UniProtKB/Swiss-Prot annotation:
GO terms for biological process: photosynthesis. A lipid is attached at residue 24 (S-diacylglycerol cysteine). A 7-bladed beta-propeller torus, about 55 by 55 Angstroms, with a depth of about 25 Angstroms and a central pore. PANTHER family: PHOTOSYSTEM II STABILITY/ASSEMBLY FACTOR HCF136, CHLOROPLASTIC, PHOTOSYSTEM II STABILITY_ASSEMBLY FACTOR HCF136, CHLOROPLASTIC. This is Photosystem II assembly lipoprotein Ycf48. It is a lipid-anchor. Keywords: Lipoprotein, Membrane, Palmitate, Photosynthesis, Photosystem II, Signal, Thylakoid. Residues 1-23 form the signal peptide. It is found in: Cellular thylakoid membrane. GO terms for cellular component: photosystem II; plasma membrane-derived thylakoid membrane; thylakoid lumen. InterPro entries: PSII_CF48-like_dom, WD40/YVTN_repeat-like_dom_sf, Ycf48/Hcf136. A factor required for optimal assembly of photosystem II (PSII), acting in the early stages of PSII assembly. Also plays a role in replacement of photodamaged D1 (psbA). Assists YidC in synthesis of chlorophyll-binding proteins. Part of early PSII assembly complexes which includes D1 (psbA) and PsbI; not found in mature PSII. Binds to the lumenal side of PSII complexes. Interacts with YidC.
Length: 333
C-alpha cells in the first residue's frame, strides 16, 4: 500500500509539474481570425535590418552579410543587388533612408554610402577614423543633407553630400543597444547593458540620462506617434509614457503574454493599433491602447524572431531573421 501511495504521489507531482510548465508557455491571448500580413521568404540566411523607399513603388531592403534587395512593386518582389565593397569585409547594412532619389546607407564596420540617383549607383564615403563609435542610424534630411548617429550616441549632420560633418552633441551617450529618432529630430537610446535610457532634443549639447523604471533591464525604447515614449523591458514588459512630455513618467507594466519570449520592437499602424514583435514568431496587436491583445496568425507560423517593424505611411514590414519578412497587404488571411 505504501508503495502504491508513493507511486500515486509521484504521478500527481508529475501531473502538477506538467501543468505548471505548460502554463509557462500559454499565451492567454486569442488568435485573430484575419491578418494584414503576408509572409515572404527571401531565400537567404541574412537578417533584414532596415527598409526604405524612394516613392510608393521603388525601395530597398538591407541587412547582414552585405544584403541589399530592390523592389519596384512596393515590396511584393525583391531582387538581389550588390554594392562595390571589398570582398574580404562582411558588412552589416544596418540603416537606409531616402529623401526622393537621394539615399544613404549606414553599416558596420565603418560604412557610409550615398546615392543621388535613387540607389542605382552608390558612392562610399570614408569616415574620419576618430569618429566615436560605429555608424548606426542614418536619416536623409533633404538635398545633399543627412544626419548620422553612431552606436555610442554621437550625432553628426552634413549639408554637402557627406564631404564634411558637424557634431551636434558635445558628449556621446556611451555604448547603446538601441537608438531611435523622432520626426522632429529628437533621439532616445538604451544603454548597452539596458540599465538606463537617455534622451536628446535638438539644441541640447548633451544627452539627458534617465534611470529605468523597474529592476528589469531595458530591451528597446522608441517614440509613439504623439512624440511620447514607449519602452520594452525584459520579462515581456511594455510601458508607455502616461504624462505627455514627461519622459520619466511611465504606466504600469503591460504584460500581454507569458510565453517565455520577450518583445524586441513596438510600432503603431495608421489606424492607431499597437503592434508588438518578438521572439519565436511573437506578433501581437492591441486596438484599444494596450488593454487587450490578439495573436497574429501569420506571425505565429513563422520560424523567426521579429526584430523590427517599419511603418512609413505607405508601407509596413515586420523584419525577421534568416530572410523572413512580413509585408502588410491587409486581410491576407
Amino acid at each position: 500500500m505504501k508503495r502504491l501511495l508513493n507511486s500515486a504521489t509521484q504521478l500527481l507531482l508529475v501531473l502538477v509539474l506538467g501543468i505548471s510548465l505548460s502554463g509557462c508557455v500559454t499565451t492567454h491571448v486569442p488568435t485573430a481570425t484575419t491578418s494584414p500580413w503576408q509572409a515572404m521568404d527571401l531565400d537567404t540566411q541574412a537578417n533584414p535590418l532596415d527598409v526604405a523607399f524612394t516613392d510608393s513603388s521603388h525601395g530597398y531592403l538591407v541587412g547582414s552579410n552585405r544584403m541589399i534587395r530592390e523592389t519596384n512593386d512596393g515590396g511584393a518582389h525583391w531582387n538581389e543587388r550588390s554594392l562595390d565593397l571589398p570582398d574580404e569585409e562582411n558588412f552589416r547594412l544596418i540603416s537606409i533612408d531616402f529623401s526622393g532619389d537621394e539615399g544613404w546607407i549606414a553599416g558596420q564596420p565603418g560604412l557610409l554610402m550615398h546615392s543621388d540617383d535613387g540607389g542605382q549607383n552608390w558612392t562610399r564615403l570614408f569616415l574620419d577614423t576618430k569618429l566615436p563609435g560605429e555608424p548606426y542610424l542614418i536619416t536623409a534630411l533633404g538635398s545633399h543633407s543627412a544626419e548620422l548617429a553612431t552606436n555610442v550616441g554621437a550625432v553628426y549632420e552634413t549639408h554637402n553630400d557627406g564631404s564634411s560633418w558637424e557634431a551636434k552633441v558635445t558628449d556621446a551617450a556611451g555604448a547603446v543597444r538601441d537608438l531611435r529618432r523622432s520626426k522632429d529630430g529628437s533621439y532616445v537610446s538604451v544603454s548597452g547593458l539596458g540599465n538606463f535610457y537617455a534622451t536628446w532634443e535638438p539644441g541640447d549639447s548633451v544627452w539627458q540620462v534617465h534611470q529605468r523604471v523597474s529592476s528589469q533591464r531595458l530591451q528597446s525604447i522608441g517614440f509613439q506617434p504623439d512624440g511620447n515614449l514607449w519602452m520594452v523591458a525584459r520579462g515581456a514588459q511594455i510601458r508607455l509614457n502616461d504624462e505627455p512630455g514627461d519622459f520619466d513618467s511611465w504606466s504600469k507594466a503591460i504584460i500581454p503574454i507569458t510565453n517565455g519570449y520577450g518583445y524586441m520592437d513596438l510600432a503603431w499602424d495608421d489606424d492607431g493599433a499597437i503592434w508588438a514583435g518578438g521572439g519565436n514568431g511573437t506578433l501581437l496587436v492591441s486596438r484599444d491602447g494596450g488593454d487587450s491583445w490578439e495573436n497574429d496568425p501569420v506571425g505565429d507560423r513563422q520560424p523567426s524572431n521579429f526584430t523590427r517593424m517599419v511603418f512609413d505611411g505607405e508601407h509596413a514590414f515586420v523584419l525577421g531573421e534568416r530572410g523572413n519578412l512580413l509585408r502588410w497587404v491587409d486581410n491576407a488571411v
